[in-house]
Amino acid sequence: MKKEKRLFTSESVSEGHPDKVADQISDAILDAILAKDPDGRVACETTVTTGLVLVVGEISTSAYVDIQSVVRKTILEIGYNRPELGFDGNNCAILVDIDEQSSDIADGVNESLETRENQQDKDDLDKIGAGDQGLMFGFAIKETPELMPLPISLAHSLMRRVASLRKEGRLDWLRPDAKAQVTVEYDDENKPKRIDTVVISTQTDATVSNDEIREAMIDMVIKKVIPSQYLDKDTKFLINPSGRFVIGGPKGDSGLTGRKIIVDTYGGYARHGGGAFSGKDLTKVDRSASYAARYVAKNIVAAGLAYQCEIQLAYAIGVAHPVSIMVDTHGTSKVSEDLLVEAVRNVFDLRPAGIIEMLNLKRPIYRQTAAYGHFGRTDVDLPWEHTDKVEALKTYVSEHAE
């Protein structure tokens, strides 16, 4: 029987993809509120379609934010700035329907179960309960310098490169909507061996030929982004394989906040708890605990305690402490996983208020995460990407190893 290749594929999308437009609007609104009211509670959902933006959700804040202005500014910065694109930040209709956060939810967050039952620890970080129940995953692996899986890392880099060529005017026929997909072949030790297939679909104007698009994407994008040792004569390049891609963005497909959760995380290489990130303040553990889980996993791998590490956290609404912590190194750990769980409990504060304080999350830093991934970013400084707990982990493990 012929031996099959070991292949894994991940995708990314550009900032002009309709779902990412929605994510960026939701996070731009969150940032605008946090800039004036760091304790604001935000759950903001956005839908975009031809000529229309709909913003709904629950927001409780002492700040005033001109949501329509934030929406228009975000759309224009992405690149939807003229009527022929079918979506134009200058003149699209914007409908806003915002309520306050449910008082029932607010009560559970503001006064945790531990506080209500007089079980809180000595500090005040027990007072804030999780904003919902749920399970969250974090992951890290030594496939790239930023400790991310190679397929999603390359897919994001391709999309950032396409966007920079468009915004710099070097390829003036590019339009904002685009997608990339990278298939990596792995060797028998599950290490990246080569790139099997690269797919790029990018929106263009009607004047450019398919041959010109293909040449530009291969020479100016793929070969500039993907290290040459991964490319060979058998690597397949599929450039705009559907043919014409002129109609795109919200004119081509409606977009919705929270529909690109695999693009946002690990490209399917690790598990996902199901909760989206964008438009949510940091009392929502869908977001903050996912960031914390990545922070934990990355520090474990950076400490040399495992080649790869997956963390699961789980919470109950209104309860400060996580109901479970799981560490899975897929057989690559240098110490027992029980010891790693113990180290995690002692080195990291995984209560919602503890996460917010540990990572300094009450800041307007989230719009920049809403395109090109929340993890493994080398172009922006994100606190959950820091590896400042490496020495604490090493010390704890060395002092408690049997």
UniProtKB/Swiss-Prot annotation:
Region (Flexible loop) residue spans: 101-111
Classification via Pfam families: S-AdoMet_synt_C, S-AdoMet_synt_M, S-AdoMet_synt_N
Catalytic activity entry: L-methionine + ATP + H2O = S-adenosyl-L-methionine + phosphate + diphosphate
InterPro entries for the chain: ADOMET_SYNTHASE_CS, S-AdoMet_synt_C, S-AdoMet_synt_central, S-AdoMet_synt_N, S-AdoMet_synthetase, S-AdoMet_synthetase_sfam
Residues where ATP binds: H17, D177, A178, K179, R244, F245, D253, R259, K260, A276, K280
Key word Chaperone present: no
SUPFAM superfamilies: S-adenosylmethionine synthetase (SSF55973)
Record's function text: Catalyzes the formation of S-adenosylmethionine (AdoMet) from methionine and ATP. The overall synthetic reaction is composed of two sequential steps, AdoMet formation and the subsequent tripolyphosphate hydrolysis which occurs prior to release of AdoMet from the enzyme.
Entries under NCBIfam families matching the protein: metK (TIGR01034)
Stated name of the protein: S-adenosylmethionine synthase
